[in-house]
Design a protein with these regions (language model features):
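Predominantly soluble domains enriched in secretory-pathway, periplasmic, or organellar proteins
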Residues: 33-435
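N-terminal secretory signal peptides that target proteins for export/translocation
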Residues: 1-14
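Hydrophobic helical h-region of N-terminal Sec-dependent signal peptides
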Residues: 12, 16-26
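N-terminal signal peptide c-region/cleavage motif recognized by signal peptidases
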Residues: 28-30
Length: 435
């Protein structure tokens, strides 16, 4: 019988090279199988605003969210994530998920169980100063979060039965204005907030109603987003619809009649130092039913007109709060949250109800001209930017096939996210920042 010959011994280097080759093949195979974010219509390459990455949120696929906020000093982005009943915190420096602070109502469905009941879901509005984060919830409460402790440290009722929604702080963080937009009549609550204090002492100071001349009870009118304007040292608050605007003989429908609402909205000017008559002015808008509001340069405030409030709204309004002169940004409407980023001198709009489909709108802060509109998932109504790092954060819902009614009815979100669970899209923008 012939003897078998053993294979010749191989050198150690050849063995290592073979192992490295196999590892490289496996790594390449794994990478090719991993979903790729920032693809499709939501990631154009010719725009100044470019899709940088997408951040996945652990837990439930994203079906419903509300307002978002950035604290550039802490390098943190906050999202009112109803799908996971908490506020998501993102590291804006490294574009990574940090944690979700729970303890909120989460998603409440309508009576038929077929869609999200926004008026009773939470969290809703969010804002922050220093280590303090404030968030409205679906049960008419303000949640006070200590970010150093990573938990809710106080819950303050505003006395309603529906959500506490949008809110804004003074620059020193000592006064907070928050609105119950779904009460009838709607109202705002002024709080003493924590400023830079170590311990919580949040307390309600006053409940603020608008004259029934403008918001008669019983017709479903609302109050929306406050913003602080440093030019006049007042809160400026968007109101989707007021009665008799325009005040022509034919009249308009603010909800007292059947059919579409035809009255336009307004902005309120609120003086937080006057607790007796805090509503200083009601400024009617021209063919604009706004949701969002953000403080821009030169005493200007952008308000996000939307056809969800007034049929036919095809523009976004920039209003000067000293003269009350205004300009309209054409070919951009349907926004909920709007945000001014001083690092890039751009306004950004979460235009989920834009005619033709949801977009991230980009507007020059000096000229007030539309720069570009970038497609988004069909419910992308929230936007916030980090002025130090010049990044824009836009939440994307998961597809309707995954989460049901309220989900993305396009493929745009899945292309941005690189998956089917929703995400937070991160866009890089040109500008001057500290980092």
């Amino acid at each position: 019988m012939a003897l078998s010959r053993f294979p010749a011994p191989r050198s150690l280097s050849s063995v290592l090279q073979a192992g490295l080759f196999v590892a490289a093949v496996l790594a390449t195979s794994t990478a090719s199988a991993r979903p790729v974010s920032c693809t499709g219509p939501g990631a154009p390459t010719t725009t100044e605003t470019k899709c940088l990455t997408a951040i996945a949120i652990p837990g439930n696929p994203i079906r419903s969210f509300d307002i978002s906020w950035v604290n550039p000093e802490r390098a943190e982005y906050y999202l009112a994530d109803r799908s996971n009943a908490g506020v998501d915190i993102i590291d804006t420096r490294h574009n990574t998920f940090k944690k979700t602070i729970g303890g909120f109502v989460g998603i409440t469905l309508n009576a038929a169980g077929t869609a999200v009941d926004n008026n009773h879901s939470g969290p809703d509005g969010v804002t922050s100063h220093g280590k303090w984060l404030y968030a409205g919830d679906g049960n008419s409460t303000l949640k006070v979060i200590d970010l150093e402790k990573g938990k809710i440290v106080a819950t303050v009722s505003t006395g309603g039965t529906t959500r506490l929604d949008e809110m804004a702080l003074t620059p020193d963080g000592k006064l907070l204005l928050a609105v119950n937009n779904a009460e009838d009549p709607p109202y705002a609550t002024l709080f003493a907030a924590n400023g830079d204090e170590e311990d919580n002492s949040v307390a309600s100071l006053a409940k603020i109603f608008v004259s029934t001349t403008y918001i008669p009870g019983g017709f479903g009118q609302s109050i929306e987003q406050p913003t602080w304007n440093e030019t006049i040292n007042r809160f400026v608050v968007s109101v989707p619809t007021i009665a008799n605007n325009p005040s022509d003989p034919a009249g308009c429908n603010y909800g007292q009649l059947s059919g579409a609402v035809t009255c336009s909205g307004a902005v309120l000017v609120i003086d937080p130092t006057n607790l007796v008559t805090p509503v200083e002015k009601v400024v009617p808008l021209v063919h604009c039913g706004p949701n969002g509001a953000t403080d821009g340069p030169n005493g200007n405030v952008m308000v996000g007109c939307t056809p969800n409030n007034q049929a036919g709204d095809n523009e976004t309004t920039v209003l000067n709060v000293t003269t009350f002169n205004y300009v309209d940004v054409g070919d951009l409407s349907g926004s909920d949250e709007v945000w001014f980023n001083e690092g890039s001198n751009r306004y950004y709009t979460g235009s989920s109800a834009m005619h033709g489909g949801a977009v991230l709108g980009v507007v020059n802060g000096t000229t007030n001209f539309l720069v570009e509109a970038i497609p988004q998932s069909s419910a992308s109504h929230s936007v916030a930017a980090d002025s130090r790092r010049n990044k824009v954060f836009v939440p994307q819902v998961a597809p309707k096939s995954v989460v049901g009614v309220g989900g993305d009815v396009t493929t745009v979100g899945a292309g941005i996210c690189g998956g089917m669970s929703g995400c937070i899209a991160v866009y890089s923008v040109p500008g001057v920042g500290d980092e």
